[in-house]
Amino acid sequence: MKYNFDKQISRRGTDSYKWDSAESENVLPMWVADMDFRTAPAIVDALRRRVEHGIFGYTRVPDSYYEAVTGWFARRHGWTIDREWIIYTSGVVPAISAVIKALTVPGDKVLVQTPVYNCFFSSIRNNGCEMVSSPLVFASNTFTIDYEDLERKTADPKVKVMLLCNPHNPAGRVWKREELVRIGEICIRHDVTVVSDEIHCELVFPEYRYTPFASISENFRHHSVVCISPSKAFNIAGLQIANIICADANRRAKIDRAINDNEVCDVNPFGVIATQVAYNEGEEWLNQLIKYLQANFLYMQEFCREHLPEFPITVLEGTYLVWMDCHRLGIHSQELEQRLVNEAGLWLNAGTMYGTEGKGFMRWNIACPRTTPVSYTHLRAHETSAHL
């Protein structure tokens, strides 16, 4: 079956955070990381059947849910997950916060690689910890890791956790196995637990390969915690569901207590159903989605090369979040964000949301029907008329 990702569906008036937060209907929102596609039809059908039942009481997590999760990762990624390693939770962000709470005490340090997903910052701060950054190195329109800096920062005995983003948001990198091995070896050497946010793991372009951090070796498995969810890949973030994978029994017990302390383990019946259907029946839909997203990126890349050479974009290996270099404009990212909204009707994320290393960059969500990138024309017209 061929799925139609070109279909335009209005999300206005649905209390969409992405669309209904705009001050004007003339603003095109390409900021928040969700997609403007309907989810897989099999998921819609399963949810419709559940709604027709009409009773939405307290729900348990069935055996079939765990079988769907473990089956998917074994089949698609070659990662064998024991059921007992899985901790159900209501989202990756609550999961990360609970894991930090479980593995640190106030005053400890947590390391990140900026620019990085901004919710990492609040999760660290809300648990009374100090953030330490080992910035990524930007060159030739891509990002790499400064291993010497990472080694130096993790050697601080106050650093207890490293938050890894794999694939990386907003850099668009899908970390190679050898890169993850070097990260893991450094962290194990300094007794730092790697907490890997792998929510974008299904959104990897065919030329690249996602490696689950905990799958690399038994040693890595027991020194890491992985957070996963079908929400990004299948566009079901509103159903609030995720899983923590932790093989180490001692860490898992601490995390389980923190999850319950934070009260983020209540079961959403629709999330449970959607996850099972996504993993059991959604693979072909996902494969077609990935091809469509890559075609969107190639379209955007070519458009920018031809019409907006002053706006180079990073090489996108995975996710649907393009990182645009706007340094040549000499405008602060937050000012540029506001000017694009006011003058071009285009809402992007200021790079500084993701750390000071994001200065001069903008993040652009391209998970939309290909007819939507009239937004590129918005940007071109703005650049031409206003000279930015």
Placement of each model-derived feature along the sequence:
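Conserved glycine-rich beta-strand-loop-beta hairpin in the small C-terminal domain of fold type I
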Residues: 276, 293-301, 313-326, 358
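N-terminal small-domain helix-loop-helix segment of the aminotransferase-like
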Residues: 2-91, 98, 278-281
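Conserved C-terminal alpha-helix-loop-beta "cap" of PLP-dependent enzymes
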Residues: 311-312, 324-363
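Conserved core segment of the aminotransferase class I/II
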Residues: 45, 218, 222-294, 298-302
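Conserved core of the PLP fold type I
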Residues: 56-185, 202-203, 210-215, 219, ...
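Conserved small/polar residues in nucleotide/adenosyl-binding loops
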Residues: 377-384
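Helix C-cap/helix->beta junction micro-motif
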Residues: 127, 189-190, 220, 344
